[in-house]
From Swiss-Prot:
The gene is Ccdc80. Isoform 2 is expressed in uterus, liver, lung, spleen, kidney, heart, bladder, skeletal muscle and brain (at protein level). Isoform 2 is expressed very low in mammary gland and intestine (at protein level). Isoform 2 is expressed in lactating mammary glands and mammary tumors (at protein level). Ubiquitous (isoform 1). Isoform 2 is expressed in ovary, uterus, mammary glands, liver, lung, spleen, kidney, heart, bladder, intestine, skeletal muscle and brain. There is a cross-link at K544, K547 (Glycyl lysine isopeptide (Lys-Gly) (interchain with G-Cter in SUMO2)). GO terms for biological process: extracellular matrix organization; positive regulation of cell-substrate adhesion; response to bacterium. Residues 1-27 form the signal peptide. PANTHER family: COILED-COIL DOMAIN-CONTAINING PROTEIN 80. The lineage of its organism: Eukaryota, Metazoa, Chordata, Craniata, Vertebrata. Belongs to the CCDC80 family. This is Coiled-coil domain-containing protein 80. The keyword Ligase does not apply. It comes from Rattus norvegicus. The keyword DNA-binding does not apply.
């Protein structure tokens, strides 16, 4: 048996030697002879390597190629891994250039593998989806909102459509935090042929709106998917599952939409999770700001490598100015020497940040304090931004944490000190702004800087004084430090400047108006030629009769005529020279006086109008209605203003002028409106600068006891004595009734009757003024028909018979719009709010009928009826006549404001007769409502539920 085993043993030994020599020769070829190619790769092994590379399993293979100390061409790198797969046990563990063991995972290896892994079809598709998300130009735009956001789709024919404009007017800047808190995103579609377009309005967590244009080709697809009707305004509210939650055929108040959303169970969880969200959102200060974006989805959230992240951070670090303290250098050496600590801290970065740290330490020579921010990773840069991430505090080195607490208070002042040139450039603005802010509160807080501000605006006389103050203020290092006390300038001129500059009409009046000192100069200079002209006239007067004598006597000689002409020329030359001399002297005197004594005696009689002068222009001619309001948007003032603007004609016949004072007591502006008849001469009582004269306004306030910052109103007669005080807005009818009892008014009425003076209301009353007449006072029931013989219109009129009490108690006004084309007209029926049966009727002009139909999108060719609430929004639409008004009353009585009215009316005992409305009286309805009467009309809740008005 031993002789049989011998050949087998020798064969095994020979094969072992051959294999060993082959592996050694391959190792020598790869290490010692890089120029030779190794022909030992079998086709099977190469196919397996290609298969692994294509399926994404060649990560280990690619790593081994990167571990070679001297890699050559791409073909060589491609061939080496095949040998490794064929003989995995022969090769020793990988080593570096100097023989030191290499870490298994290095940053360059990851980069190399990533470049090879691009061949993977699945990963490239994923990265493509991340780089180009479903944006506004993508057909699956709704899919980007699925599971995350609710979608509010607004569809309109075009941007100028009436309903669309009405809906956008309801979207004030202060509603977007509420929308963001409910995860609502908006899509606007314009579907009219030729004007197709739209936009996606993404609302951020700060309330900012990111607008992206919508691809017009997507409009028909979205319209068909959401089942929106073309040619009409409509809105759809989608759930987070993209199911339709609610449809709205006309604009609605946002409260109604909120109520629909808040009924969902998921909304309760959102409320718990997002406590204080709205307050934080509003505190950001950018609520309602619109930012236009491209149509790539605004995302760009692609998977960027770690290397690209480092490249993004480096330029941000290089921009930091050397404002930190030198001891921060110690943290640089600590971060540079130990390699393991950065690994758990910097977002799964292996020791690659070591190279960044060494690079940063080499820059310490040029910038002293920069290395701290470089080695501390993004966490150290966060304290310099406005928002702090929660992880930045825990991973920050202790030295940097101390420095942030020390530097914390100074961040609000100025983060990075500017160079000296920029400091000098920015100093005047820094000293000017805080004083402007304080001037709104009080005028005596910082007088030196206010004088400096005023003097920079002045041109001419005060320029020397300005230069000196400029030099003083440039000496201060801190821009927020108020300069030292200057010499107080006495007199009235600086105060006037100070007051004018401190009010809100500064830009309007102060830029175009010269200062009073210039006005004095111009007045004096203008007076001088007039005196010289008088003197020259005196010289010329005796010469004229001499000429006449010479002509009459005919005895004068030509030489005498020549002499007289020479004398005239000499006199003219002298007068011109005297004019120029006096101009120079006066100009020099005024400049010297202003330089040495800013308030000379000739400046004292300023053209400021006193209260006596102001009231003297009204006395015996006009009655005054004086109103004070803290701001022009004050609700009480707006209500009173709408009241008197509606009755322009009655104000004019009673000769009323309205003086309105805006702003607080110490910083007010004034507006004067004269209501006059057509045959009266237009009045101009004060100049523009007097409207912002604080002294005049404060004196006027004291004269009539209007020394508060609240709404207040005073009525006077033509003798300017106070007749009535009002602390709240009041109907102008009661004011007119009071005025008609004055003795002066009775005389005016008799005089106007004799002269036949009548006042016609404005022929072209605007739609806005007409609708503002009913806002927050009346509900409108608009009925439109092609003519008064229309069948539906006549049926509706029969249903309205005998409903005067119900209409009056519900504050309903009926507006009838009749006619087609040019033959149109309207009738307005006003029902008393006490429920009496008397009805006041007014004619509505043709142009207003057309405007109302266009505004509410009512077709003149068909019958239609709509209910408009007190807030001016359409509450319900009725395309056919309502045989019974029960449904209309149900809708009105379910509104929040109406419930308050019902409580007041019941306490006062105001009610309609039980038999008037066929057993559906006021009391019986109230009982039915308490018992759930509204459930019988549940189909109305989808459109009208939740309306507060």
């Amino acid at each position: 048996m031993t002789w049989k085993m011998g050949p087998h043993f020798t064969m095994l030994l020979a094969m072992w030697l051959v294999c060993g020599s082959a592996s050694q020769s391959s190792a020598l070829d790869s290490d010692g002879r890089p120029g030779r190619k190794v022909p030992l790769a079998s086709p099977i092994s190469s196919r397996s390597a290609r298969y692994l590379r294509h399926t994404g399993r060649s990560g280990g293979v690619e790593k081994s190629t990167q571990e070679e100390p001297n890699p050559q061409s791409f073909q060589r790198r491609k061939s080496v891994p095949v040998l490794r797969l064929a003989h995995p046990t022969v090769r020793p563990p990988p080593s570096g250039i100097n023989g030191a063991p290499v870490r298994p995972e290095l940053k360059p290896i990851a980069r190399g593998s990533a470049s090879e892994m691009v061949r993977d079809e699945g990963s490239s598709a994923r990265t493509r989806m991340l780089r180009f998300p479903s944006g506004s130009s993508s057909p699956n735009i709704l899919a980007s909102f699925a599971g995350k956001n609710r979608v509010w789709v607004i569809s309109a024919p075009h941007a100028s459509e009436g309903y669309y404009r009405l809906m956008m007017s309801l979207l004030k800047d202060d509603v977007y935090c509420e929308l963001a808190e409910r995860h609502i995103q908006q899509i606007v579609l314009f579907h009219q042929a030729g004007e197709e377009g739209g936009k996606v309005r993404r609302i951020t967590s700060e309330g900012q709106i990111l607008e992206q244009p919508l691809d017009p080709n997507l409009i028909p697809k979205l319209m068909s998917f959401l089942k929106l009707e073309k040619g009409k305004f409509s809105m759809v509210l989608l759930k987070k599952t993209l199911q339709v939650e609610e449809r709205y055929p006309y604009p609605v108040r946002l409260e109604a939409m909120y109520e629909v959303i808040d009924q969902g169970p998921i909304r309760r969880i959102e409320k718990i999770r997002q406590k204080g969200f709205v307050q934080k959102c509003k505190a950001s200060g950018i609520e309602g700001h619109v930012v236009q974006e491209g149509n790539n989805g605004g995302g760009g959230g692609g998977s960027t490598g770690l290397g690209s992240d480092k490249r993004k951070e480096d330029p941000r670090r290089t921009q930091i100015h050397p404002t930190r303290e030198p001891p921060r250098k110690q943290t640089t050496t600590k971060a540079a020497t130990p390699q393991p600590p950065p690994t758990p801290r910097a977002t799964t970065l292996p020791p690659a940040p070591v190279t960044t740290a060494t690079r940063a330490t080499s820059r310490v020579v040029t910038v002293a304090a920069r290395p701290t921010t470089t080695t501390a990773y993004p966490a150290t840069q966060r304290p310099w931004t406005s928002r702090l991430h929660p992880f930045s505090v825990s991973h920050r080195p202790p030295a940097t944490a101390e420095m942030t607490t020390v530097r914390g208070p100074s961040v609000s002042e100025q983060l990075y000190p500017l160079p000296r040139k920029e400091q000098q450039r920015e100093k005047p603005q820094a000293t000017r702004r805080p004083n402007k802010a304080t001037n709104y509160g009080s005028f005596t807080a910082t007088p030196p800087t206010t004088l400096w501000e005023g003097s920079t605006r002045a041109v001419g006389t005060s320029r020397f004084r300005d230069n000196r103050t400029d030099k003083r203020e440039h000496g201060h290092q801190d821009p927020n430090v108020v300069p030292g006390p200057h010499k107080p300038i006495k007199g009235k001129l600086p105060k006037k400047k100070e007051k004018i500059l401190s009010n809100e009409y500064e830009a309007k009046y102060d830029l175009s108006r010269p200062t009073t000192s210039q006005g004095e100069e111009e007045l004096q200079v203008d007076n001088i030629p007039s005196q010289n002209a008088k003197e020259s006239k005196k010289h010329e007067k005796p010469e004229k009769p001499e000429k006449e004598k010479k002509k009459k006597g005919k005895s004068a000689k030509p030489d005498k005529l020549l002499r007289s002409e020479k004398q005239m020329k000499k006199a003219e030359k002298k007068s011109k020279q005297e004019k120029e001399k006096t101009k120079k002297k006066k100009a020099g005197k005024t400049e010297q006086d202003d330089y040495q004594k800013p308030t000379a005696k000739h400046l004292a009689p300023s053209p400021r109008k006193s209260v006596a002068d102001l009231l003297g222009s009204f006395e015996g001619k006009r009655r005054l209605l004086l109103i004070t309001t803290p701001k022009a948007e004050n609700n009480m003032y707006v209500q009173q203003r709408d009241e008197y603007l509606e009755s322009f004609c009655k104000m004019a016949t009673r000769r009323i002028s309205v003086v309105t004072i805006f702003g607080p007591v110490n910083n007010s502006s004034m507006k004067i409106d004269h209501f006059q008849l057509d045959n009266e001469k237009p009045m101009r009582v004060v100049d523009d600068e007097d409207l912002v004269d604080q002294h005049l306004i404060s004196e006027l306030r004291k004269e009539y006891g209007m020394t508060y910052n609240d709404f207040f109103m005073v009525l006077t007669d033509v003798d300017l004595r106070v007749k009535q005080y009002y602390e709240v807005p009041i109907a102008m009818k009661s004011v007119f009734d009071l005025i008609d009892t004055f003795q002066s008014r009775i005389k005016d009425m008799e005089k106007q009757k004799k002269e036949g003076i009548t006042c016609k209301e404005d022929k072209r009353q605007s739609l806005e003024n007409f609708l503002s007449r009913f806002r927050w006072r009346r509900r409108l029931l608009v009925i439109s028909a092609p003519n008064d013989e229309d069948w539906a219109y006549s049926q509706q009129l029969s249903a309205l018979n005998g409903q005067a009490c119900n209409f009056g108690l519900r504050h309903i006004t009926i507006l009838k719009l009749l006619g087609v084309g040019e033959e149109v007209g309207g009738i307005l029926e006003l029902f008393p709010i006490n429920g009496s049966s008397t009805v006041e009727r007014e004619d509505v002009p043709a142009h207003l009928v057309k405007d109302i139909r266009n505004y509410f999108q009512v077709s003149p060719e068909y019958f239609s009826m709509l209910l408009v609430g007190k807030d001016g929004n359409v509450k319900s639409w009725y395309p056919s006549p309502m045989w019974s008004m029960v449904i209309v009353y149900d809708l009105i009585d379910s509104m929040q404001l109406r419930r308050q009215e019902m409580a007041i009316q019941q306490s006062l005992g105001m009610r309609c007769p039980e038999d008037e409305y066929a057993g559906y009286g006021y009391h019986s309805y109230h009982q039915g409502y308490q018992d759930g009467y509204q459930d019988d009309y549940r189909h109305h809740e989808s459109y009208h539920h939740g309306y507060p008005y």
